[in-house]
């Protein structure tokens, strides 16, 4: 019973936090700014960017396999980043940070967002995607907003 109550409380806090940031607009701090232009509501396909942030390689079609030794030896990082950059280039510059945040939102942190240093590292990787792709200034997500 106590566990059920805690789960309900966590769900309430998560939905309240999500609504708080959804109502206030995006966190797009690239050079062009958010301005008065609206970004599309549908989420763009940034699957490779999610894989890059999560340090995943796809070795078989639609079957994610994480190979840390292969990743750090450069076996697939470059290829995944290039695909991510190609996908990011299809998004308007003022919408890129919101799109990146939207794609990784909820994907980080393991159980109930608890992941320690790994989550921080993944958020940092997500924030620097635009500069890694030579597409402008890094994104800045709100501090303490770790999904």
From Swiss-Prot:
Residue ranges of the propeptide: 20-28
Pfam families with a match to the protein in the record: Tryp_alpha_amyl (PF00234)
Chief place of localization: membrane
Signal peptide bounds: 1-19
Gene Ontology molecular functions: nutrient reservoir activity; serine-type endopeptidase inhibitor activity; toxin activity
Keyword Transport recorded: no
UniProt keyword Metal-binding present: no
Free-text tissue specificity from the UniProt record: Found in endosperm and aleurone layer of developing kernels, but not in the embryo.
Compartments, record wording: Membrane; Secreted, Extracellular space
PTM section of the record: Five disulfide bonds are present.
Gene3D superfamilies named in the record: Plant lipid-transfer and hydrophobic proteins
InterPro entries assigned to the protein according to its UniProt record, in alphabetical order: Allergen/soft/tryp_amyl_inhib (IPR006106), Bifun_inhib/LTP/seed_sf (IPR036312), Bifunc_inhib/LTP/seed_store (IPR016140), Glia_glutenin (IPR001954)
One GO biological process term: defense response to bacterium
SUPFAM superfamilies: Bifunctional inhibitor/lipid-transfer protein/seed storage 2S albumin (SSF47699)
One GO cellular component term noted in the UniProt record for this chain: extracellular region
CDD domains linked to this entry: AAI_SS
Keywords, in A-Z order: Antibiotic, Antimicrobial, Disulfide bond, Membrane, Plant defense, Secreted, Signal, Toxin
The protein's role, per its UniProt record: Acts as a membranotoxin, probably through its antibacterial and antifungal activities, contributing to the defense mechanism of the plant against predators. Forms monovalent cation-selective ion channels in membranes. Contributes to grain texture and hardness.
Protein's recorded name: Hordoindoline-B2
Organism the protein comes from: Hordeum vulgare (Barley)
């Amino acid at each position: 019973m106590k566990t059920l109550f805690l789960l309900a409380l966590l769900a309430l806090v998560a939905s309240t936090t999500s609504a708080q940031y959804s109502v206030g607009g995006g966190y797009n701090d690239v050079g062009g700014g958010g301005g008065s232009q609206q970004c599309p509501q549908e989420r763009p396909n940034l699957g490779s960017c999610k894989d890059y942030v999560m340090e995943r390689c796809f070795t078989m079609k639609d079957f994610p396999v994480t190979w840390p030794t292969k990743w750090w030896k450069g076996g697939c990082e470059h290829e995944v980043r290039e695909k991510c950059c190609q996908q990011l280039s299809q998004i308007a510059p003022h919408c890129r940070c919101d799109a990146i945040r939207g794609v990784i939102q909820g994907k980080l942190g393991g159980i109930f967002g608890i992941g320690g240093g790994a989550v921080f590292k993944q958020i940092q990787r997500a924030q620097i995607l635009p500069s890694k792709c030579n597409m402008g200034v890094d994104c800045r997500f709100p501090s303490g907003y770790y999904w």
